[in-house]
């Protein structure tokens, strides 16, 4: 028992934080600069970039529920995570060699199918670890924000001074290192394989609070994740350099860390829905400011508010989705939550953003983001009202 506790403490202090740092370092190395790469190096049109950047959310929407169901069915989430990491790294290297629009499309689909498993499986493992050993999920997840922030700065500088293709090699190297570390992630006893039934999944989807959370996730996280595709173009259009893009992402992602660490304490004090409302209102204000064609210095200054919006929204929404689900379908619930926000919402916002960018300017993209987020605030208000009603009935 003592040995198990020591291993749990060691995993919480070193293995999980380093693992999150590596996987988000990989994402930060590739995705913020990918749209700029497709524009500057591949010479693709705005509509073509919009289509390619909308593919990962489409694939995520289809693949993530399958990964989550597979994890609940096989009871082997670490093995599935390891396979996804290695294959995503392989497709990342192949992406660097692509030279045509069709090849970009094929590799984007393959890469996205593997990459879509990484975060929900990692989150399920981390949440299970915190449940078993104690601790703070936000304190683990903040290392992902730090990894993302360091990657966009370091890889942005390297792509400016060496070669743009370095974004793909940095992505793959970080994922392979994370795969090696994944073999040390703790494995906890789980139910027998095959215990998950269709009735379990139907019961989850029949929950109205869970459905409302999915709608709010679509409207809140769709713009947040689509921003990763268009934020570099916004700064580039305002006169920023690749290193400047890296600095902006550094400020934005780095500001998330303290809020993620404080998320559990704030949840206990204010409640999950109130924190999500605060995050949504801050995001809406930020998108409206970007739609107004602000000066570059203003964009750099306002990136730090991402900590109060995204830094609170990610751990709060994830834990809320898990709380609403029965234990036997929690991996599926996390995967569905991720598929709707990271998949459907991001796809919709990225695709519409591409057409708005082609027809008008980047400001129209951020005006659309603000409208989506404001509608998301209304859904969260409905969810808050339902929670109050349920509390009064009890």
Swiss-Prot record:
The chain crosses the membrane at residues 12-38, 46-74, 79-104, 109-126, 138-160, 164-183, 214-233, 238-262, 273-292, 296-318, 331-358, 362-382. It is a multi-pass membrane protein. This is Maltose permease. One of its GO terms (molecular function) is cytidine transmembrane transporter activity. Residues 1-11, 75-78, 127-137, 184-213, 263-272, 319-330, 383-394 are cytoplasmic. Belongs to the major facilitator superfamily. Coiled coil: none annotated. Pfam families: MFS_1_like. Signal peptide: none annotated. The keyword Transcription does not apply. Its main location: membrane. One of its GO terms (cellular component) is plasma membrane. InterPro entries: MFS_assoc_dom, MFS_dom, MFS_trans_sf. It is found in: Cell membrane. Residues 39-45, 105-108, 161-163, 234-237, 293-295, 359-361 are extracellular. The gene is malA. High affinity transport of maltose. Gene3D superfamilies: MFS general substrate transporter like domains (1.20.1250.20). Keywords: Cell membrane, Membrane, Symport, Transmembrane, Transmembrane helix, Transport.
């Amino acid at each position: 028992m003592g040995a198990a506790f020591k291993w749990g403490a060691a995993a919480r202090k070193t293995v999980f934080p380093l693992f999150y740092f590596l996987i988000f370092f990989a994402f930060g190395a590739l995705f913020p600069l990918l749209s700029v790469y497709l524009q500057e190096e591949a010479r693709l049109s705005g509509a073509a970039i919009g289509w390619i950047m909308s593919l990962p959310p489409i694939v995520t929407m289809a693949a993530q529920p399958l990964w989550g169901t597979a994890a609940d069915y096989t009871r082997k989430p670490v093995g599935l995570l390891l396979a996804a990491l290695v294959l995503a790294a392989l497709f990342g290297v192949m992406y660097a060699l692509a030279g045509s629009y069709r090849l970009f499309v094929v590799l984007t689909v393959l890469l996205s199918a593997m990459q879509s498993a990484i975060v929900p499986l990692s989150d399920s493992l981390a949440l299970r670890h915190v449940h078993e050993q104690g601790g703070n999920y936000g304190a683990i997840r903040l290392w992902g924000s730090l990894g993302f922030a360091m990657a966009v700065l370091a890889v942005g500088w390297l792509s400016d001074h060496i070669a743009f293709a370095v974004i793909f090699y940095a992505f793959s190297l970080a994922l392979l290192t994370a795969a090696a570390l994944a073999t040390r992630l703790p494995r906890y006893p789980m139910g027998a394989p095959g215990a998950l039934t269709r009735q379990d999944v139907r019961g989850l989807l029949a929950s109205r609070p869970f459905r409302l959370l999915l709608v709010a996730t679509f409207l809140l996280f769709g713009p947040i994740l689509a921003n990763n595709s268009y934020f570099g173009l916004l700064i580039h259009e305002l006169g920023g350099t690749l290193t400047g893009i890296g600095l902006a992402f550094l400020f934005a992602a780095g500001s998330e860390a303290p809020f993620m660490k404080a998320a559990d304490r704030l949840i206990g004090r204010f409640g999950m829905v109130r924190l999500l409302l605060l995050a949504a209102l801050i995001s809406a204000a930020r998108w409206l400011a970007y739609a107004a064609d602000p000066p570059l210095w203003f964009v750099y200054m306002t990136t730090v508010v991402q900590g109060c919006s995204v830094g609170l929204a990610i751990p709060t929404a994830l834990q809320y989705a898990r709380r609403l689900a029965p234990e036997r379908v929690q991996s599926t619930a996390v995967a569905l939550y991720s598929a709707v926000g990271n998949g459907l919402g991001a796809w919709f916002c990225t695709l519409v953003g591409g057409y708005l960018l082609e027809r008008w300017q980047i400001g129209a993209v951020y005006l659309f983001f603000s409208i989506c987020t404001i509608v998301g605030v209304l859904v969260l208000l409905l969810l808050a009202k339902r929670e109050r009603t349920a509390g009064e009935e009890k």
